[in-house]
């Protein structure tokens, strides 16, 4: 038997060339230390920033700090099952979540896993959670109304589709209630409105009690609004990385509708807790602290999230994503770090006040401090026609009311202003879970601005409103339909509406 040296060396070369290939297939690293939801990992040389990595037992993490000798990984889950020396694998994918209509009616966590016990999610597509916002060219200015069903908001601080309107106030002032009522107000459109007007709702609960989230979902379910809503929950007991990720995950789910020529609305409840979670992660990752110990890029955290809410132009499908971020203030301090940041990013704010809430003015909107910077161009013309003067009248009323506490003998015009203001304030009150259609709001505010309430006692205003609405719904449905179809108060409609209100006012007296 002769030995062929060339053949042997060729085989050896081939084997040497393939040696050690298996070990490189999934790049791995080793846990150096773990605690407080953060793991320091040695190895993972080629890991990308924001890449998903996997720990033993299927626990996921995200590489955030890429340092010269180790990688700082935040852990999406319990860190008690991870120990020093564990092997960490790269997944090669940036953190993504399932998106699409299959998520409607479901409650999921920040990674898109179902937590409502209704079986697996049927999703055809996955999206990265952190993508760049649309540029300037694909956008269009906000011009379609996004009705909340609340008179105080739709008349005075209107929100348009694609706008970012901040809801800000102390704890227990009804911030979540505004989002909930807005979701419920979309029910009639989903039942029998055109597809182009349907608004899909996404609710992100960050750092809230589980009981609160369960209550929110229960109300949506009972009122038939869960079928067009998605709830993302990162509750108070979830790790900080989940609370940090939840808004981005919700945004990706909302963007699916925006990019497919549909309209979506997302409520982030609330971003103060996301900032706190991000601060905790940053400090544990040893990033340098800034003002109020928040990291230097906490402004960028919120701006890159909220910039993704947009109205796209017709070439890009004309879809929209409207954002209602919530910020909780401490003792009405709007000048703290996070509130000022988010106020400067958004297109206006609805400012809720504890004092008003306890006076029984609910929704407790402070009309003087609340603004909508782009909403007026989206307001329905009919609403503009009737509500134009309200804001001024209410501002004058507040000024006079403060002044009238001192003087007893007021002239007739001041007295008239005070009377009108008190009745308008009463008119803007609204119980929870009872959103009104735009045409009904127009009719009610028309009655208020045209002096029909001036002769009625303040405590009878609510009764007058309820009576007027039921009379319009039953006997004058044609007037409401005309306002809805025309979207403006023509002379003809105005005359009909005036006649209807006149008739009711006579019978009410």
UniProtKB/Swiss-Prot annotation:
GO terms for molecular function: ADP binding; ATP binding; proton-transporting ATP synthase activity, rotational mechanism. This is ATP synthase subunit alpha. Keywords: ATP synthesis, ATP-binding, Cell inner membrane, Cell membrane, CF(1), Hydrogen ion transport, Ion transport, Membrane, Nucleotide-binding, Translocase, Transport. The record marks 370 as: Required for activity. Its EC number is 7.1.2.2. Disulfide bonds: none annotated. The keyword Protein biosynthesis does not apply. It is a peripheral membrane protein. ATP binds at residues 169-176. One of its GO terms (cellular component) is plasma membrane. It comes from Brucella anthropi (strain ATCC 49188 / DSM 6882 / CCUG 24695 / JCM 21032 / LMG 3331 / NBRC 15819 / NCTC 12168 / Alc 37). F-type ATPases have 2 components, CF(1) - the catalytic core - and CF(0) - the membrane proton channel. CF(1) has five subunits: alpha(3), beta(3), gamma(1), delta(1), epsilon(1). CF(0) has three main subunits: a(1), b(2) and c(9-12). The alpha and beta chains form an alternating ring which encloses part of the gamma chain. CF(1) is attached to CF(0) by a central stalk formed by the gamma and epsilon chains, while a peripheral stalk is formed by the delta and b chains. Coiled coil: none annotated. It catalyses: ATP + H2O + 4 H(+)(in) = ADP + phosphate + 5 H(+)(out). Belongs to the ATPase alpha/beta chains family. The keyword Membrane applies.
């Amino acid at each position: 038997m002769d030995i062929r040296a060339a053949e042997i060396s060729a085989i050896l070369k081939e084997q040497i060339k393939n040696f050690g290939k298996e070990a490189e297939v999934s790049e791995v690293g080793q846990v150096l230390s773990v605690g407080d939801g953060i793991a320091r990992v040695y190895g993972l040389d080629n890991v990308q920033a924001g890449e998903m990595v996997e720990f033993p037992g299927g626990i996921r993490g995200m590489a955030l700090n890429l340092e010269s000798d180790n990688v700082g990984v935040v852990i999406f889950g319990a860190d008690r099952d991870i120990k020093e020396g564990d092997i960490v694998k790269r997944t090669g994918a940036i953190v993504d979540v399932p998106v699409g209509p299959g998520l409607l009616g479901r409650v999921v966590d920040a990674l898109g896993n179902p937590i409502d016990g209704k079986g697996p999610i049927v999703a055809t597509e996955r999206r990265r959670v952190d993508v760049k916002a649309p540029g300037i060219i694909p956008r269009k200015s906000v011009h379609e109304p996004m009705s909340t069903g609340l008179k105080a908001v739709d008349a005075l601080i209107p929100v348009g589709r694609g706008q970012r309107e901040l809801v800000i106030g102390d704890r227990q002032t009804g911030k979540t209630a505004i989002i909930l009522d807005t979701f419920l107000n979309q029910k009639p459109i989903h039942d029998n409105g055109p597809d182009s007007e349907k608004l899909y709702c996404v609710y992100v609960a960050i750092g809230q009690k589980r009981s609160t989230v369960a209550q929110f979902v229960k109300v949506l379910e009972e009122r038939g609004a869960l079928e067009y809503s998605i709830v993302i929950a990162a509750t108070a007991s979830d790790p900080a990385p989940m609370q940090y990720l939840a808004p981005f995950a919700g945004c990706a789910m909302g963007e699916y509708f925006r990019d497919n020529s549909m309209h979506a609305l997302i409520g982030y409840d609330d971003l103060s807790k996301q900032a706190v979670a991000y601060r905790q992660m940053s400090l544990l990752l040893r990033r340098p602290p800034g003002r109020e110990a928040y990291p230097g890029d906490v402004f960028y955290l919120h701006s890159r999230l909220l910039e993704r809410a947009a109205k796209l132009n017709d070439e890009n499908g004309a879809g929209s994503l409207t954002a209602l971020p919530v910020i909780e203030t401490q003792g009405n301090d709007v000048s703290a770090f996070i509130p000022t940041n988010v106020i400067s990013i958004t297109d206006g704010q609805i400012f809720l006040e504890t004092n008003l809430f306890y006076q029984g003015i609910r929704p407790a909107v402070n009309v003087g401090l609340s603004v909508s910077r782009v909403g007026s161009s989206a307001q329905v013309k009919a609403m503009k026609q009737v509500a134009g003067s309200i804001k001024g009248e209410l501002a004058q009323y507040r000024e006079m009311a403060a002044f009238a506490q001192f003087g007893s003998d007021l002239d007739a015009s001041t007295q008239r202003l005070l009377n009108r203001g008190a009745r308008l304030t009463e008119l803007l009150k609204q119980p929870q879970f009872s959103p009104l259609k735009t045409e009904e709001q127009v009719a009610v505010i028309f009655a208020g601005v045209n002096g029909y309430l001036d002769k009625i006692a303040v405590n009878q205003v609510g009764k007058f409103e309820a009576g007027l609405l039921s009379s319009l719904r039953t006997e004058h449905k044609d007037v409401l339909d005309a306002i809805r179809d025309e979207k403006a108060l023509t002379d003809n409609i105005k005359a009909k509406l005036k006649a209807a209100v006149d008739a009711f006012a006579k019978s009410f007296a």
